[in-house]
Regions:
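N-terminal nicking endonuclease/strand-transfer module with a His-rich metal-binding environment
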Residues: 1-185
């Protein structure tokens, strides 16, 4: 859950007493992109270029849905089992998506800390399952509690976010992510 600010964009953690949430839908265009996201989300690397990951805190991460295999193989199995179909899609259609919910740490620490964060993201996960039409369309959902939040002065500096990685194909057709549509709705 690395927050990369665009030029002129302010950090969520501004220490101004206002709680902020960032929901970002990221298209994953190639299987290589999916593999990189999996390595990050599932903490499969021995070393990270992201210096904000604190390996000693990785045990605090919470899976709301653990992957049963690597993400690309899971997607392929879903196709074989006819849970999803890619028939008729344009060759350049995006098949995978990642939805990141990021909330400034102070919000959690002011409302009950780690346990509150776990419940918050459990509820977000339940909503995502309902919106996409079932848990079978979600490959993995994990709350990261092992990343520093350098911009959050006055808190413990731990950033908590959850990432929901899904196949980009949902019941009823279409290539848009209904989670994001519902949030924007």
């Amino acid at each position: 859950c690395l927050q990369i600010l665009k030029k002129g964009q302010k950090s969520m953690a501004r220490n101004d007493g206002i709680d902020r949430t960032l929901a970002r839908n990221q298209d994953l265009e190639t299987p290589d992109d999916v593999t990189k996201v999996q390595e990050h989300n599932e903490r499969e690397k021995d070393r990270y270029s992201n210096v904000d990951i604190v390996p000693e805190r990785t045990a605090l991460n919470v899976h709301f849905k653990s992957p049963t295999d690597d993400y690309v193989k899971m997607f392929e199995q879903m196709e074989q089992d006819k849970i999803i179909s890619t028939r008729g899609l344009k060759p350049d259609a995006v098949k995978y998506g990642e939805l990141v919910f990021d909330v400034n740490s102070a919000y959690f620490y002011n409302h009950g800390g780690y346990e509150f964060a776990k419940q918050f993201y459990a509820d977000a996960y339940k909503a995502a399952v309902e919106i996409v039409g079932g848990e079978q369309y979600i490959l993995s959902a994990v709350m990261h509690a092992d990343e520093r939040n350098r911009g959050n002065v006055g808190s413990s500096g731990v950033r908590m976010c959850t990432t929901i990685t899904s196949c980009g194909l949902y019941p009823g057709g279409g290539e848009t992510n209904p989670v994001v549509e519902a949030m924007q709705g």
